[in-house]
Amino acid sequence: MLRHRLAALFEPRTLAVVSDRPLPVDQSTPALLNNAVTHIPVPDAVADKVPCRLQGLPDGERLDLALVCVPPASTPAVLEALRRYRPRIVLVLAHPEPSDDPTQDTIHCRDWSRRNDCLILGPRSFGVQRPHLGMNLSHHPHGALPGRVALVTQSRSIAAAVLDWAADVSLGFSAVISVGDEGVIDVAEVLDYLSMDPRTDSIALYLEETTSSRRFTSAARAAASVKPLIVLKVEEALDEDPVHVAAFNALLRRVGAVRIRFFVQLFSAIKVLVHTRRPRGKRIALLSNGDGAARLALDVMGTGATVYRAELAAASIEGVGQLLEKGALADNPVVTYAPLTAERMRGLLDILVEDKGVDGVLVLLAPDPLADLESVVDVLAAVAPASRKPIVTCLMGDSSMRRLRHVLDEAGTPAFRTPETAANAFGILAGYHYSQTLAQQILPPEPLSRPPDTDKARQLVQAAQRRGQRVLSPCEGLELLGCFHVPIQLADDVPEGSPVMAIRVRKDPKLGPCMSFGRGLEPFLRAEAAVELPPLNGYLARQLVQRSGYWQGTLSRSLTPVAAEFLREALERISLLVSDVPAIESLDIDPLCLEGDTLVATGLEVKLSSASMLVLPETTGYSHMAIHPYPRHLAQMRQMHDGRPWLLRPIRPEDAEPLQEFVRGLSDESRYMRFVSMLRELTPHMLARYTRIDYHRELALVATINEPNPVHRGHPRERIIGFAHYLRNADGRGAEYALVIGDEWQRCGIGSQLMRMLIEAAQEQRLTYIDGLVLGANRPMLGLMTYLGFRVDSDEEDPSMRRVWLDLGETLG
């Protein structure tokens, strides 16, 4: 099995320690490193008098990890001394002695890393902990308890504070990582590792800034697609550009992460993420021994929170009423004023959990000297962890309630101190589920839109730049929009009675262009505006409109279906424009009005950057954008051996239904050869995984033909007849491919052309090899791979499988 490139950091096999001060690892050596740790005195390292051999390191092998904690002025000499061992990773801890030039320290680490093929975490990292291994490679004096939540932070103080708090409430972690100054290993690379880490069920991230928006976007998307990712990001300054704030919020929403805004919410998130049961919706039932706590929780739910009060079924209300005293509240919130008993708590929980209109239960308890709260908490400790729906508790108070909260914490169910934090924690769980539901939604198929005249648009912009023109005239702006078939016309005046809208584009220095839709003739990013990052498809464009306050208050009633479709198309095509023409600094269509069903603009301004377009964005991977757009330039018409035409193109989210039809249409043998199982159709998760592609790190291609559609009077429809994709391997250097061709289209030359395109794309992404597992009985596939230059090896773990692989360096040569 391939080893992840960060495995040497999180699961090192050999370790060298160079430190001028005591570290926790000196007192407790992890079991996996028994007889494999070498302590090198700092004077020896600085003088390059390091030992020839290290403990547990065979001759000729690389050292996995070096832990360095020395004054910044000594770090370069220590790194040079470590070259002898060719370390895979160096962890540079923060040192009490300040640096004269922190920026130069980081630059030196990057240069040394590049010259020596070695990754560096730091400088000025707080360190790394892997509690299940007993490994504490940090400054924190105590190792965290083992758990299933990973903590990643860019702040040493935040890491220390969270570890101290977690020890007090007996919360554990799968990993704790403080990245420091991100010399080489950054947050994105850590997220990549944690997304595949079997010990990690969820990730809590404290973020101050992102050094590479594209890498962060890609890694966050990969992580959030398989486990909850909670992000606390501080604003970099009190006067931070609101465009960046809105763009970053849009980015997190796009990748499926959940953003929190306050430090106290980080504690709530970490605590609630240990809950193995996740809500399937947003409807919450409240159970309280007094109405004060319930009112506080409802206040939180009523201020734009992710969750809301569930409507109980009539049978549930009747059942609850039979268990409560006269005068109690049986409809949500369920409130009892009599002393609670264990039997009553168990009965109430059973009813609320069984209600189909309830997705989770929030139990709020205040101290009650007349009640046996210990027995009540014992019921919660027994019922909540085993419940099929999440049960979150809030035990208000400290003197008598702290010990009871610890009982629930030890039982593995989160117990909070205030109604606000408990309700917010539920919102975090529900928010993640909601984002994943959206991510797996099957979009209806849509035809590829009419291709734009990109060359003409770029020539228009370049001509203006050569003239020193930074702002296009309205007529030039309209011509630019016309190159991308944006359905908007110019008008002199606002039509009477028309709604006044605005479409705006601004360029964020880190995240690239962001789009806004809302009320016209207002400052950018008014409260009623919604923001999204391009590229947009039809679904995202509709969501952008419908998320705006202007739609909810006015447009939903005044916009006709035809006009709404024109608006959707305009947004989608403007997003394509700013993707393909990076020189656009800003774009304002304000006011945007309606003349009948036609979109007309009485104000149009396009500002250009001063940098000329010498390099086409498709050759740089659209580096000016946080999200890689659909690589339309890869779409090509091809021919089969007999001359029949077919289209080779990258897959889109809208291909989910056609791809499902393709898989259903495969023969049992073809499905088994591809999936090594007898599945008859793809699961929703598999469909989303194969069609919602991160073009920055992977690629999926389809072969399609046009055929008459009997449902629509024989009008042509696109049909998928072949599918190929590759996903990056854990080592970050190669990718695993998969290929399947429809039965009636095999031996037509389609498979070889799809594979050649995959190989070219993998080379452009600087991968060094591409491989895959093929059933030994699949002789046609083995023959094709051999024909394409792949080598065939037996699989060590399964004799029925073959590993086929291609060295892309050799192919390039």
Predicted regions located by residue number:
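Catalytic activation segment of kinase domains across protein kinase-like and atypical kinase folds
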Residues: 599-613
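Long, contiguous binding/interaction regions
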Residues: 610-813
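Catalytic-core regions of core metabolic enzymes
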Residues: 1-603
